Design a protein with these regions (language model features):
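Conserved, well-structured interaction surfaces
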Residues: 50-130, 136-175
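Internal, well-ordered domain-core segments that constitute the primary functional module
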Residues: 154-229
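Single conserved hydrophobic/aromatic residue that forms the stacking wall/gate
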Residues: 254-266
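Membrane-proximal, proline-rich intrinsically disordered regions
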Residues: 1-55, 63-64, 71, 89-92
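Carbohydrate-binding/catalytic loop surfaces
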Residues: 140, 177-185, 230-253
Length: 266
């Protein structure tokens, strides 16, 4: 054997971060319906029952005795932060693995918008969270401050407005954007709609400020038609679909053994 190769290089692992791949994975976190056991769901109005139940009943129907935000910081939020960092670094932003996803300004803008959307629902469910000092472990800040919800809402509105102004409608993103297929107009509408949602909730405690923020977001133009809805499309392919096959198998056993059981558990 004359050329054994380099055993310290894994040919199956990328040598450079690809921002398109980082963004695709971050987008997968919008599909969940609630937050529990490392899943993110935007319907935070349903979650207080999970949080309060364990104070009264250790084992209840909700089955949510523990929870953590670690997966959201580790994956979608961190991925978006890395996209922002790569596209802001003069030595990185021009590399093929970066620019193939789209122009730098739009990458930063969509990453900030998606982060804002996720942060909004996390703080709505949990209140204080690390925001201003998040992602500073590289600077040896391992105990970030938990910002108040008031601070987070103010920062989210400001950061989302900055992101909105960064969008370049003459540019686009690649198909790595699995939510809007690179449509910058759609991302701008989601950005403005997220700010409107923040403002409506803020108005419950600060009507004047909520009204002011809403007016600005509304003027920017939010989602007004179904064509611009935030949708997560699942594949119809069920080949090798383990859980789907398991459901079919178990249901068939119920039908065979005792059909009335299906009515009871449905």
């Amino acid at each position: 054997m004359t050329d054994f190769g380099d055993i310290n290089k894994d040919p199956n692992e990328p040598s450079e971060a690809n921002t398109g791949m980082l963004f695709t994975y971050a987008c997968t976190y919008v599909k969940y319906f609630s937050m529990n056991s490392n899943y993110y769901y935007p319907w935070t109005q349903m979650y207080p029952g999970y949080m309060s139940e364990k104070n009264n009943n250790q084992y209840g129907a909700f089955g949510g005795p523990t929870m953590s935000t670690s997966s959201y910081y580790l994956y979608p939020l961190k991925n978006c932060q890395k996209i922002i960092d790569f596209n802001s670094d003069e030595t990185e932003k021009g590399k093929p693995a970066i620019v193939q996803f789209g122009d730098n300004a739009n990458q930063i803008a969509v990453a900030r918008t998606l982060m804002g959307f996720i942060y909004m629902h996390l703080t709505d469910a949990l209140g204080p969270l690390p925001y201003t000092e998040a992602f500073q472990a590289g600077e040896e800040n391992f105990t970030p401050v938990f910002d108040s919800q008031e601070t987070i809402y103010a920062k989210l509105d400001a950061d989302l407005r900055e992101a909105y102004n960064q969008f370049n409608e003459s540019g686009s993103l690649s198909t790595a954007d699995i939510l809007f297929d690179g449509d910058i107009r759609a991302w701008k509408k989601l950005n403005a709609s997220t700010r409107m949602m923040l403002a409506i909730k803020l108005a419950d405690v600060d009507p004047a400020e909520g009204r002011s923020r809403f007016a600005q977001a509304y003027a920017d133009g939010g989602i007004e038609e179904n064509a611009y809805n935030l949708n997560y499309t699942f594949e119809a392919n069920t080949v090798g679909y383990l859980y789907y096959n398991g459901v079919n198998y178990n249901l068939s056993l119920i039908h065979i053994s005792e059909p009335t059981r299906l009515q009871l558990i449905s």
